[in-house]
């Protein structure tokens, strides 16, 4: 058995602001408020993107994070990646968003399953998933309004 010492790194984790945009409504109080905040970021893209908005205790967005960029019809999303930014942001809650490049906003079975996984993971972390919006051509579907949350 070797008694050779092993070096352990001391690290820090930081978030870096990449850009920003103005948003008039300070508090998110409805799915439409959330859609108005994110629509310019997700409409018209040629591949799926999955994003989250981190909110404080007053339901004010503190940041938006791109979690995954996928292909024409799917993006691979893992709860670990979703909650990484939320934890670093000290978020009280999150809203999930992704686009459907086809413009059709009907949730797929995979969309519903992911929403359920994110809800459960949020409960474990103490970060509530308020909604999951699917963004299409000038429209959106709220999975909360559809009864999936």
Q: Predicted segments — roles?
A:
Residues 69:
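Glycine-rich nucleotide-phosphate-binding loops and adjacent flexible coil segments
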Residues 1-14, 24, 33-36, 56-58, ...:
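Active-site-proximal loop/helix of nucleotide/amide-processing enzymes and allied scaffolds
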Residues 8-66:
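Long amphipathic N-terminal alpha/beta scaffold segment
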């Amino acid at each position: 058995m070797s008694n050779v010492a092993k070096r352990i790194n001391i690290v820090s984790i930081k978030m870096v602001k990449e850009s920003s945009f103005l948003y008039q409504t300070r508090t998110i109080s409805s799915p439409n408020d959330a859609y108005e905040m994110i629509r310019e970021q997700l409409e018209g893209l040629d591949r799926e993107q999955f994003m989250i908005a981190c909110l404080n205790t007053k339901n004010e967005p503190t940041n938006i994070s791109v979690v995954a960029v996928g292909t024409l019809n799917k993006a691979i999303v893992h709860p670990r990646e979703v909650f990484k930014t939320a934890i670093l942001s000290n978020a009280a809650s999150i809203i999930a968003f992704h686009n459907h490049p086809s413009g059709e906003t009907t949730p797929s079975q995979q969309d519903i399953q992911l929403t359920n996984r994110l809800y459960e993971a949020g409960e474990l972390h103490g970060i509530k998933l308020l909604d999951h919006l699917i963004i299409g051509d000038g429209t959106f579907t709220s999975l909360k309004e559809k009864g999936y949350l």
